[in-house]
């Protein structure tokens, strides 16, 4: 057998005993009334625990604040979406017609949610130690590279400090669009920044996430010329 799911399982480093779990983890709410949001809820908590536990033992002298910032960096939607792209998850997602048409298989929030759902599915298919090993294998290079300190500050904080250090005005964030139902919204934010010609656009499942995405893009533009 060499089905598409077999190929994905090889990328994930885990073979499911219950194929229904991986299929459910890949099913977006737009595609079916049985979808991956409950698995996502479970996977989110498991991921947070596994990463927190690793950081606690990896950095025995680091304070709670730095560990929280490192964990936030590792479990944020952007990082999860990167993992999703490394697994080519977009090729396997089950989306409704509207999401397919709008390119949902490329959207950070959908990829990130699917990664969390897969973590939940692996846990239900095995146990906490098995899922811990899988998650740590996915995160190995990121855990080796991460260090406590300034780099773990969120993008809005880093952008503010960057501008303050150059005596420039603080950025102005404006919500320009909100679409979707209350439980599944996408926010679009414009960020006006001194030194950047056009407003920078950020999108996210909340206003805060959209502002953070815009701030991160603005920082990249300012620091890369």
UniProtKB/Swiss-Prot annotation:
One of its GO terms (biological process) is mRNA processing. It catalyses: Endonucleolytic cleavage to 5'-phosphomonoester. The active site is at 44, 116. Its cofactor is Mg(2+). InterPro entries: dsRBD_dom, RNase_III, RNase_III_dom, RNase_III_sf. Keywords: Cytoplasm, Endonuclease, Hydrolase, Magnesium, Metal-binding, mRNA processing, Nuclease, RNA-binding, rRNA processing, rRNA-binding, tRNA processing. Mg(2+) binds at residues 40, 113, 116. Pfam families: dsrm, Ribonucleas_3_3. Residues 154-224 form the DRBM domain. Residues 5-127 form the RNase III domain. The keyword Translocase does not apply. GO terms for cellular component: cytoplasm. The keyword Metal-binding applies. It is found in: Cytoplasm. Digests double-stranded RNA. Involved in the processing of primary rRNA transcript to yield the immediate precursors to the large and small rRNAs (23S and 16S). Processes some mRNAs, and tRNAs when they are encoded in the rRNA operon. Processes pre-crRNA and tracrRNA of type II CRISPR loci if present in the organism. Belongs to the ribonuclease III family. Homodimer. HAMAP family: RNase_III. This is Ribonuclease 3.
């Amino acid at each position: 057998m060499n089905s598409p799911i077999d190929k994905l399982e090889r990328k994930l480093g885990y073979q499911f005993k219950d194929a229904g779990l991986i299929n459910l983890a890949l099913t977006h709410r737009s595609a079916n009334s049985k979808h991956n949001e409950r698995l996502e809820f479970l996977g989110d908590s498991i991921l947070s625990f596994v990463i927190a536990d690793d950081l606690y033992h990896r950095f025995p002298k680091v304070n709670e604040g730095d560990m929280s910032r490192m964990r936030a960096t590792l479990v944020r939607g952007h990082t999860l979406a990167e993992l999703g792209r490394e697994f080519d998850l977009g090729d396997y997602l089950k989306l409704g017609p509207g999401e397919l048409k709008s390119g949902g298989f490329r959207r950070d929030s959908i990829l990130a949610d699917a990664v969390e759902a897969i973590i939940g599915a692996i846990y239900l298919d095995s146990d906490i130690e098995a899922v811990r090993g899988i998650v740590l294998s996915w995160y190995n290079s990121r855990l080796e590279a991460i260090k406590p300190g300034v780099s773990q500050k969120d993008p809005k904080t880093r952008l503010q400090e960057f501008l303050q250090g150059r005596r420039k005005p603080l950025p102005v964030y404006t919500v320009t669009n909100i679409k979707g139902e209350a439980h599944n919204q996408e926010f679009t934010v414009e960020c006006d920044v001194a030194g950047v010609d056009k407003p920078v656009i950020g999108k996210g499942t909340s206003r805060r996430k959209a502002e953070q995405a815009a701030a991160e893009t603005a920082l990249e533009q300012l620091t890369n010329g």
